[in-house]
């Protein structure tokens, strides 16, 4: 079946449908990762967006029930150049097209995604429409122009509905296929998926869920945190009532300026508990500290973003997924920039000079992407331990 991708500026790309049929709209963005499409599809940070992959062939290893970052796809649509005609992985449960169709997500293939990417790099991210009704291209352009993204609170669509202790039996935290030689394999299921042992929990943590990826939770647990997840709308009083040792601010979708409730909560927590934020959590922390954010021209999305630690001079290749950034000129004097993105010089990390509050504008947990920055979870554990010692 034919399909088309219509951009709000009038550009149209023709292709073939895979996945569900119908029409969808959202902000179209591109991701430069070569693999990890399943994690990308299920990352809540992509809520409200149509994702285009720059790598030319997608779908060759299918989809399985373990490598997900949430319980269902979060994207509005998926754009690729070529869908792999075969699935070659012993871990696959289904193929990519069947997975998208099951969840009602439209996909379009046969598009020159690198031409699309160049267009978005030149013109900036924009609203778009994917439709299998190719009889009215002008109507598809109009639907793209009417789509809403900026200022929309997508966090309320993906946050937890109630407070809960995550993975109380540690089963999910032990599920991990990729072995790096440092963990002891203690169990395996019938399909050969292996499970590792975990360190004992030494700290308690309240995690504000703005759209948290599962591997963030796994990473926190692997670093000794017992995590209680709270809805994004939780107040500072509700967080402090838990009596946890620290507070984590998660990733999530959309415009941070739309989250006044989260900004107030975090503002009220600064100086009372050690804080660490990732991605949207980084932006919310910056807003709570009095800074401003702005929309990037086309965002940072992929597993090859170089970041420099200004304190050590070291470079890390990081996984990133955001369309907004912190304005460094708006940061107060008692907040320092600790990391910068080497591609465009934008703020990639910050910390408060007086209080235990820090954040990074990327994903230390990867999934997908490199593991250069996963040490941040251990560093946060040290911060929490120091705060407990000095309490």
Model region roles, listed by residue range:
Residues 1-237, 241-242, 256, 367-369, ...:
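RNA-binding accessory domains that recognize and position tRNA/RNA substrates
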Residues 83, 252, 355, 365:
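Flexible loop residues that form catalytic
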Residues 106, 204, 274-276, 292, ...:
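Proline-centered loop/turn at the N-terminus of a beta-strand
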Residues 241, 245-246, 251-325, 369-387:
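Cysteine-nucleophile active-site neighborhood
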Residues 313-356, 391:
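Catalytic beta-strand/loop cores that center a nucleophilic Ser/Cys/Thr
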């Amino acid at each position: 079946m034919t399909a088309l991708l219509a951009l709000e500026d009038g550009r149209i790309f023709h292709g073939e449908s895979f996945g569900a049929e119908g029409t969808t709209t959202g902000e179209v963005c591109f991701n430069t990762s070569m693999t990890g499409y399943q994690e990308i599809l299920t990352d809540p940070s992509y809520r409200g967006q149509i994702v285009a992959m720059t790598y030319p062939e997608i779908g060759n290893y299918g989809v399985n029930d373990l490598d997900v970052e949430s319980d269902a796809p979060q994207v509005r649509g998926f754009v690729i150049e070529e869908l792999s005609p075969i699935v070659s992985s012993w871990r696959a449960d289904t193929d990519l097209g069947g997975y998208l169709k099951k969840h009602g997500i439209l996909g379009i293939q046969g598009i020159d995604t690198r031409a699309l990417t160049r267009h978005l790099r030149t013109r900036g991210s924009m609203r778009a429409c994917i439709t299998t009704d190719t009889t009215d291209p002008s109507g598809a352009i109009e639907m793209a122009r009417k789509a809403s993204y900026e200022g929309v609170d997508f966090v309320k669509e993906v946050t937890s509905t109630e407070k809960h202790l995550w993975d109380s039996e540690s089963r999910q935290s032990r599920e991990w296929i990729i072995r790096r030689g440092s963990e002891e394999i203690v169990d395996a299921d019938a399909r050969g998926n292996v499970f590792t042992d975990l360190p004992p929990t030494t700290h308690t943590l309240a995690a504000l869920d703005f759209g948290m990826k599962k591997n963030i939770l796994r990473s926190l647990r692997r670093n000794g945190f017992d995590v209680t997840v709270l809805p994004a709308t939780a107040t500072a009083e509700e967080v402090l009532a838990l009596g946890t040792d620290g507070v984590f601010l998660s990733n999530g979708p959309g415009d941070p300026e739309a989250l006044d409730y989260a900004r107030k909560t975090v503002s009220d927590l600064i100086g009372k508990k050690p804080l660490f934020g990732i991605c949207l959590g980084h932006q919310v922390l910056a807003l709570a500290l009095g800074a401003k954010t702005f929309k990037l021209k086309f965002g940072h999305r992929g597993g090859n973003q170089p970041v420099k630690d200004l304190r050590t001079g070291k470079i890390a290749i990081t996984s990133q997924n955001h369309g907004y950034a912190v304005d460094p000129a708006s940061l107060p004097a008692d907040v320092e920039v600790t990391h910068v993105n080497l591609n465009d010089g934008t703020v990639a990390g910050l910390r408060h000079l007086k209080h235990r509050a820090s954040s990074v504008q990327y994903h230390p947990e990867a999934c997908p992407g490199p593991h250069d920055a996963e040490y941040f979870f251990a560093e946060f554990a040290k911060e929490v331990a120091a705060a407990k010692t000095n309490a």
